[in-house]
Amino acid sequence: EDCRRQRQMCIRDRCQGYSEPGSGSDLASLKTKAEDKGDHFVVNGQKVWTSYADDCDMIFTLVRTGPQEPKHDGISFLLIDMDQPGVTTKPIKLISGKSPFCETFFDNAVVPKENLVSELNKGWDVAKRLLQHERNMIAGMGLGGAGSAKKKKDQAITSGMATMAKTYAGEEDGKLANSSLRQKIASFDINSHAFSLTMRRASEESKSSNSGPSPASSMFKYYGSESNKLRYELMLEAMGTKALGWEGEGFGPAELAITREWLRTKANSIEGGTSEVQLNIIAKRVLDLPQ
């Protein structure tokens, strides 16, 4: 019954309460605590970089319930109603001008015991699994796919980089005039196609074995993040001075959108686990290298 009810809660608009000030890459050091009060928990603490928390009505949250346990073993996974006294959010304005992230504060927020997912102090196992799914989603940004949450009107630009580059840099004999940029875009397209096929193969193998995401998701997340940053670097190189706009006349809406999205991509190698963390996971769990 609890599983059925929790699934229904997760269908609602929800956000993810993982990172905290001082607990980002070392997520297991989180300080937000949930005290057992019999039939409910009382939660106090702060989360940060909570995507769209100001528009959500539920947050799934990592909290510390076993302060005397080893840090990975004293964490629980709670579903918390955002529309209650003691839960507040504050949007964070990014360099891109957007505010998709928020700070989320818990001040004696009450959470029923039935909102505990899995077992008490076993939330880290749930969180790791969800992070693998998130990393696969973020990896899709390297392909300009749905995982990047781009609007359809922007996808036409980001998926036709060579065509767009010709518009700004000109063409000779049907080819992009700038030979250096042409080689960079060709290399990017080849690598993107190979990456797409690799992700598809891994997905099919995962479905056939019913094993779900694996540590290989860190490989995809790392490559996808770096690839998406490169995608926008190449577009800005092609646009030249048209990439310098922020607002006002002389720049089209699509040009301004690309410039702002380029700024946003700098977070790709941080969110969902930094590129450095992914490399450590790859070394340890995929390549089995000695520490």
Question: Whereabouts are the PLM-identified features?
Answer:
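C-terminal helix-coil-helix/basic helical segment that borders enzyme active sites and/or dimer interfaces
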Residues: D173, S179, H193-G250
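Glycine-rich phosphate/cofactor-binding loops in nucleotide/flavin-utilizing enzymes
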Residues: V126-G144, M239-Q291
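A short core secondary-structure module
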Residues: H40, N44-K90
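A structural signal for short hydrophobic beta-strand segments in well-ordered beta-sheet cores
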Residues: T32-E35
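A short, Trp-centered hydrophobic/proline-enriched beta-strand micro-motif
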Residues: R12-Y18
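Single conserved hydrophobic/aromatic residue that forms the stacking wall/gate
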Residues: E1-R7, I11
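Glycine-rich beta->alpha junctions and the first turn(s) of the following alpha-helix
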Residues: V87-S196, N268
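Glycine-rich phosphate/pyrophosphate-binding beta-alpha loops
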Residues: V48-A53, I95-S96, A267-G272
